Amino acid sequence: MSIDSLWRTVLWKQFGAAIDMFDNALVACPDSLWRQPVWPASPDPAERTEFWYVAYHALVWLDLYLSGVPEEEFAPPAPFVQGEIDSNETLPEQPYTREDLRAYLASLRLKCRDVMETMTDEQASRLVEYPWSEGQPISFLELQLYNMRHMQGHAAELSLLLGQHGVHGDAVDWETRAPDDLGDN
């Protein structure tokens, strides 16, 4: 296996594991915790701390970063609103359902695997810039590592909340690598 092929495979296996851990948290979350704040801080509006919203936030940014386009050129698929990226005032009219979020995540898992497995040297080295990069463009490849860390960070937050409320076991266990097949994840 060439280093290029090895790198793409390793990147997918670890990114896929982060996505799978995130999905495990969505599946394991009881209805009683769907609107539970993940952390005590109170941004405005407070709904932005709820389990479902943190999940939505992570998915929208996962999609944007996999696309590698500027924020102003991105729109999430229906039924999701753009507000997460371009406005602090726009919230969905009601919390997204677990089914909607899992369907979006399933499509993003496929997109992620495709991006990781087909990334060329030219694509990997293409420079992208986002407001948080403070005027310092980064490579698309580095963006994907950032994206993976962002996804895993939110998977950990959601899993921690579940654990604090007595949800334990296989549903929130560590995923070491994504499986070889796409399966049901």
Predicted segment positions?
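Long, well-ordered core segments of solenoidal/helical folds
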Residues: 26, 116, 120, 181-183
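Active-site rim elements
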Residues: 4-12, 95-102
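Hydrophobic alpha-helical core bundles mediating ligand binding, dimerization, or RNAP-core interactions
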Residues: 15, 19-22, 26, 105, ...
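Residue-level signal for short amphipathic helical patches enriched in basic/charged
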Residues: 29, 61, 119
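Short, contiguous alpha-helical
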Residues: 2, 8, 12-16, 20-23, ...
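Acidic/histidine-rich alpha-helical segments that form the ligand environment
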Residues: 87-128, 139-154
